[in-house]
Structure formats: structure tokens, C-alpha cells
């Protein structure tokens, strides 16, 4: 199963540098904290619509080439993050199989739990970068995060109903 928002997410084109944008946009696009937490701070009930969770081969995660270690299998999770039932964000997480050892194995079992609820409670979380992307009228971003030094790639597309617009 797929979703049109995930097709748009995969079509994001990234800027070489942070573009000169309105402060409101940059505030959302460069947020270092959890989007789940940000949505909840707006008084919204946050839920996850799980689109896909599975191991996939390299050919299904080409956007990770050069950003993650080259491996034969990756854990792929695709979701819609909803605020009061309305989709505000499409998310795609690519996790190399080698990252899934020790406590990070929980990444395979999040189900309908928002990723941010796990990531941003970890004292071992670091972020290597945030890149801003755009597809037509929609904005997105991707980040390489590390848990205990082990990488994963998180891509987020802000959907039309989100407060970014």
C-alpha cells in the first residue's frame, strides 16, 4: 500500500544550502525538536496512520545512497502524522539493518507510536544535518540522525493542512 503524499515526499528536491525563506517557514523546517511534540504544543491530538513497515532492499531506498552505509537490507517505515485526525505530515524513515542492534531494535516495533516519542527521549540522539526540500508547492526536509552513533534517515513532507502554510 502507498499514499500520494509519499510519492510527493520521494520527489522532494533539496537545496544545496538553507534558502532565504520567511522566518515562519524556517521555524518549522529547521526545528531541532520532535514534530510530534510541536503538534501537541498546538493543542492537537497526534496519531499515526501506518502506511508501510518492512525490510526492503537498496533499490527501494535510493535516496539514502551516500547518506547511509551501503547494506543489503534497510528497515523502512512510512507514515502519516495526523493532528486531530487530519494528516499534517508524511514521514519516511530508512534505518540500516546494522543500526537495529541493542536498544535501537525498538525502531522495528513502533507501529502506531510516533517516531519522535522514541527518538527525542533518547540521550544518545544526535542530528548530523537538516536539508530543506520542495516539491511543487509543498515543503519538506530530511535529516540524518544517530542513536548511539548509529545512523538513520528521516524525511518529512509538510502536507497542505499543516500550520507551516
UniProtKB/Swiss-Prot annotation:
Gene giving rise to this polypeptide: ubiC
Chief location of this protein within or outside the cell: cytoplasm
Catalytic activity: chorismate = 4-hydroxybenzoate + pyruvate
Enzyme Commission number, as recorded: 4.1.3.40
Gene Ontology molecular function: any one: chorismate lyase activity
Any one GO CC term of the record: cytosol
Protein name: Chorismate pyruvate-lyase
PANTHER family: CHORISMATE PYRUVATE-LYASE (PTHR38683:SF1)
Pfam families: Chor_lyase
Entries under InterPro entries matching the protein: Chorismate--pyruvate_lyase (IPR007440), Chorismate_lyase_/UTRA_dom_sf (IPR028978)
Subcellular location: Cytoplasm
The organism's taxonomic lineage, starting at the top: Bacteria, Pseudomonadati, Pseudomonadota, Gammaproteobacteria, Enterobacterales
Subunit comment: Monomer.
Pathway: Cofactor biosynthesis; ubiquinone biosynthesis
Binding-site residues, substrate: 35, 77, 115, 156
Amino acid at each position: 500500500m502507498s499514499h500520494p503524499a509519499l510519492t510527493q515526499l520521494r520527489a522532494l528536491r533539496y537545496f544545496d544550502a538553507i534558502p532565504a525563506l520567511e522566518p515562519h517557514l524556517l521555524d518549522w523546517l529547521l526545528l531541532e525538536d520532535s514534530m510530534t511534540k510541536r503538534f501537541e504544543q498546538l493543542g492537537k491530538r497526534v496519531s499515526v496512520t501506518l502506511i508501510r513497515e518492512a525490510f526492503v532492499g537498496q533499490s527501494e531506498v535510493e535516496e539514502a545512497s551516500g547518506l547511509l552505509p551501503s547494506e543489503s537490507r534497510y528497515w523502512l517505515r512510512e507514515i502519516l502524522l495526523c493532528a486531530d485526525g487530519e494528516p499534517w505530515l508524511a514521514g519516511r524513515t530508512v534505518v540500516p539493518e546494522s543500526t537495529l542492534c541493542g536498544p535501537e531494535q525498538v525502531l522495528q516495533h513502533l507501529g502506531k507510536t510516533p517516531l519522535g516519542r522514541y527518538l527525542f527521549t533518547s540521550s544518545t540522539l544526535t542530528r548530523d544535518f537538516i536539508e530543506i526540500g520542495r516539491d511543487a508547492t509543498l515543503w519538506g526536509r530530511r535529516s540524518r540522525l544517530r542513536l548511539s552513533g548509529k545512523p538513520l534517515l528521516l524525511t518529512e513532507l509538510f502536507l497542505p493542512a499543516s500550520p507551516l502554510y
